[in-house]
Curated annotation (Swiss-Prot):
GO terms for biological process: antibacterial humoral response; defense response to Gram-negative bacterium; defense response to Gram-positive bacterium; innate immune response. Cecropins have lytic and antibacterial activity against several Gram-positive and Gram-negative bacteria. It comes from the Eukaryota. One of its GO terms (cellular component) is extracellular space. Keywords: Amidation, Antibiotic, Antimicrobial, Immunity, Innate immunity, Secreted, Signal. It is found in: Secreted. This is Cecropin-B type 2. The gene is CECB2. It holds the Pfam family Cecropin. Its main location: secreted. Residues 1-24 form the signal peptide. InterPro entries: Cecropin, Cecropin_insect.
Length: 60
């Protein structure tokens, strides 16, 4: 494995993320999308978990 190329790629990505934008516009949008995904997963698990626990209780 060529670690120098991998290190250069990681460094380049880090520089783009940290210095590419002076305001948090793009990163804020990404954060909002991730937050929305988390909320949807949480709501879906709230709906599914009681069904699964009820199914396990019936199987006993």
């Amino acid at each position: 494995m060529n670690f120098s190329k991998l290190f250069a790629l990681v460094l380049l990505i880090g520089l783009v993320l940290l210095t590419g934008q002076t305001e948090a516009g793009g990163l804020k949008k990404l954060g909002k999308k991730l937050e929305g995904v988390g909320k949807r997963v949480f709501k879906a698990s709230e709906k599914a978990l009681p069904v699964l626990t009820g199914y396990k209780a019936i199987g006993k």
